[in-house]
Amino acid sequence: MPEYRSKTSTHGRNMAGARALWRATGMRDGDFHKPIIAIANSFTQFVPGHVHLKDLGQLVAREIERVGGVAKEFDTIAVDDGIAMGHDGMLYSLPSREIIADSVEYMVNAHCADALVCISNCDKITPGMLMAALRLNIPTVFVSGGPMEAGKTKLAEHKLDLIDAMVIAADDSASDEKVAEFERSACPTCGSCSGMFTANSMNCLTEALGLSLPGNGTVVATHADREQLFLRAGRVAVELCHRWYGGEDPTALPRGIATFEAFENAMTLDIAMGGSTNTILHLLAAAQEGEVAFGMHDIDRLSKRVPQLCKVAPNTPKYHIEDVHRAGGIMAILGELARGGLLHTNAATVHARTLAEAIAQWDVTQTDDETVHTFYKAGPAGIPTQIAFSQATRWDSLDTDRSEGCIRDIAHAFSQEGGLAVLYGNIARDGCVVKTAGVDESIHVFEGTARVFESQDAAVKGILADEVVAGDVVVIRYEGPKGGPGMQEMLYPTSYLKSKGLGKQCALLTDGRFSGGTSGLSIGHASPEAAAGGAIGLVRDGDRILIDIPKRSINLLISDEELALRRAEQDAKGWKPVEVRPRKVTTALKAYALLATSADKGAVRDKALLDG
């Protein structure tokens, strides 16, 4: 049987000094034979999705100790993409994912922890911790801080979120008073932003991967029911320890749970719910850490056969994550996919022997268990607060309408092709991605004129100055992992196109990425990126670009000979922006850029460079 990793520092005469230090943290004689479980928290007052996490690590710790473990909490960093958006702060967002993964590895391995509870929530924190969990491969369970309640105001008929505040601010026809009202109403509580943006998408995907508990992605942060998820996570961590160290059960480990089949399940869910395009980047990165051969071609294959069963903001103003929960949450979507034969239901989870068992227990349309039905009735209270578990409001009924409700069955899908797609062509040899869930069907095939910008900042200025017109394809390049560096999100350009009335009349192509709040014909992750010799660096103003989502293609409409000639010219000049960009690239960012791969590899470090 495997021995506790912690015995390295808790057993033997030569570890007297280490035990002395452990005792100084509060450990006693009887604790040295128990599993030491690390709690990776991510509390910070900078991020609304994490502002309420301060005491939640200790909530988990007390439960771990109650059921026979030793708990040791630490914190990692968390960047708020919305606050970092639109300035050089966004250069740090994606690189922070690697720092988070490293910091969890450093703490867990330095102190020989036996298991791990990951308390995450927002955009790069869940992916960073997921990468660490698969890298470490010790018993791990995820529990997130939960989604924010959607905002409300008398000035709008629909619920609000961050994107509404950004779009209204760029609308010249909106009064200052209306902008202020949207600003004050859009983000009313603690939690990750209320739509199917990156944070909520990733927290939902941990359910499909089998690494978190039912409801992890959908119970609002303010609801008392989420407290039970934290307590149960503590108990599950100890159970996983017993299963691995006491029984050598491989399904107690992240790599025994998050297998190739589990990654297919997660991506299938992602496509079905129209998740953020960033999830593709993060799943590819996590797969590499877990040594799972899951890549862009697998995503492309799945995107052609998985229907879209759920449509949530920013893809529609009608529904937010709180509405997904009322409809049965992620387990309900997985249930519909399973009935369509689209899942590997024999995959393991941290809370059930198989995904099939989990669905049977938690899908509200399959079970009569009143406890489960009550759980999914947990709803928003509409009271602004930064306090977790502060309300216990419940809907009067569940949304089980699978023909016209928030979650659909396959026969009544929003679209028979899913919400995400991979496009290939001479402008993106290794692929690029688009959230089809947010693209109006009238522009699924779009031919337009290239309007090229060498940075996001230049594109924003051009859009606001009305230099972009209907029929243009806005090309923003040298914003990839290396070229940015840091692969900025392009939320401001897409929001400003909307506010200018061009959301359905223009396309945007970039080697950068998009916020989970983006909608419209926004195509990101063009690979290879311009800084790595990608053909997006060869596009010129006035070129024609053809985008064909049904055919999964994107092409620069010039001859192969012209493309080769341009490449030779660019090779001679060097692959860098034509214009000097007023951008401070620090040593930390240069270190990230030096090792970063393009988006089709998850923008992770190039291990070939490290291994020499």
From Swiss-Prot:
Gene3D superfamilies in the cross-refs: IlvD/EDD C-terminal domain-like
Residues at the catalytic site: 515
Protein purpose: Functions in the biosynthesis of branched-chain amino acids. Catalyzes the dehydration of (2R,3R)-2,3-dihydroxy-3-methylpentanoate (2,3-dihydroxy-3-methylvalerate) into 2-oxo-3-methylpentanoate (2-oxo-3-methylvalerate) and of (2R)-2,3-dihydroxy-3-methylbutanoate (2,3-dihydroxyisovalerate) into 2-oxo-3-methylbutanoate (2-oxoisovalerate), the penultimate precursor to L-isoleucine and L-valine, respectively.
Similarity comment: family membership: Belongs to the IlvD/Edd family.
Cofactor(s), names only, from the UniProt record: [2Fe-2S] cluster; Mg(2+)
GO cellular component: cytosol
Biological processes annotated in GO: isoleucine biosynthetic process; L-valine biosynthetic process
EC number: 4.2.1.9
HAMAP family: IlvD
Pathway membership: Amino-acid biosynthesis; L-isoleucine biosynthesis; L-isoleucine from 2-oxobutanoate: step 3/4; Amino-acid biosynthesis; L-valine biosynthesis; L-valine from pyruvate: step 3/4
Positions with a binding annotation for Mg(2+): 81, 123-124, 489
Single GO term (MF): dihydroxy-acid dehydratase activity
UniProt protein name: Dihydroxy-acid dehydratase
Gene it is expressed from: ilvD
